[in-house]
Swiss-Prot record:
Cellular component per GO, a single term: cytoplasm
Superkingdom in the source lineage: Bacteria
Protein's UniProt keywords contain Amino-acid biosynthesis: no
Subcellular location: Cytoplasm
High-level lineage: Bacteria, Pseudomonadati, Thermodesulfobacteriota, Desulfovibrionia, Desulfovibrionales
Gene encoding the protein: prfA
Name listed for the protein in its UniProt record: Peptide chain release factor 1
Family that this chain belongs to: Belongs to the prokaryotic/mitochondrial release factor family.
UniProt xrefs under InterPro entries: PCRF, Pep_chain_release_fac_I, Pep_chain_release_fac_I_sf, Prokaryotic/Mito_RF, RF-1
Protein modification: Methylated by PrmC. Methylation increases the termination efficiency of RF1.
Amino acid sequence: MFAKLEHLERQFEDLEQQLSSPEVFGDQERYRKLTKAHSDLKEIVEVFRVYRQLNEELAGNKEMLRDSDPEIQAMAREEIDAIEKRLPEMEHELKLLLLPKDPLDEKNVVLEIRAGTGGEEAALFAADLFRMYLRYAEDMGWRVEVLSSSETDSGGFKEIIGLISGDKVYSRMKFESGTHRVQRVPATETQGRIHTSAATVAVMPEADEVELDMKPEDLRFDVYRSSGPGGQSVNTTDSAVRVTHIPTGITVACQDEKSQHKNKAKGLKILASRLLQAQEDKRHEELAEQRRSLVGTGDRSGRIRTYNFPQGRITDHRINLTLYKLDAFMEGQIGDMLDALITHAQTEALKAQANVH
């Protein structure tokens, strides 16, 4: 591990030298790439330098134990205790920082929420989930744009798709994919009975046609008239667009905009992200077979979380974590849960790495 860290430190120092060169500063593209590489290494190098400094201080304090002065010995022991407590924590931090980075972590995400079993109550829950993620995105300083939505008469959503843009959105949101189950008394329920319904969430890295090399001949576009809640026509022109990726059969429909051109652009954005996610799912499946352990796939088929309103609790079934702060959670205070999921994924990755070596 330490040879690897020393190698990264040399790389970091080399990048610092290059960035101070006027020649590099004049080439904006090269400067941008070097700045990014420098930024990626900065944290791990800084932690390693502190770790190395602490080891040097530990050796120095052990030397001081040989001193004949009891006061100096006592001070040295105190320092040794403090350093020996800190070193394992820093070593663990370095191991985490050395884990291979997910190349998609920096990306924006396309968030799809669909009402599942439970009829109108499921559609209302889908709307609640979208609002929850919207609040969280606002707290994080991210931007949210609705790409497509299918609203119900009561203000719920059969489906809503949004683009969340900002700093490392995918790294925080990628574990939200799956089936979210809700247990609560619907507003229309007169007997006070608790109903169970569900919504599915898919979090996909934003992609573009260039990244995926989508060929025009692989795409089919169909146009039709937009319809609103209850199926009534809301447009007299054929502005809604359905995009089909012929090789995979993946289909996206967009009708939110009055312009056919805008609906087509949004449809392509969603399609590209679905294709990239399909590639990512396949890669994760291959990795899982190799390691015999599934690390953070965002599997959409399984029930991942239950929201129990009568008890005011949220339980994430993947990590067996229950939080009793449902009201705050639904207002977007989901950071604690996301942190726990990220920590769990890192722990699993460390275990998998240990099994490989």
